[in-house]
């Protein structure tokens, strides 16, 4: 019997609670997560070349659909590059995860 990983439980939880749109910047630290999202039929994902673009796309997604998007990136500098986009969401009171 293959047991589910914590990240699989987390992604399933998000999808079950209508957080089904993901904005991704791939990297070594999140390859298993991206792979799992890619295998989920219920999930929609968009890949970006820069973390700030992914965060701003999540902001635009909320503005146009009213649904909160999920931004995923790799650790280290990748996470740091999210700050401008996340701060923009915070200043505009736009929810993002």
Segments (PLM) and residue ranges:
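N-terminal alpha/beta PP-like core and its mobile active-site loop of ThDP/TPP-dependent enzymes
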Residues: 1-97
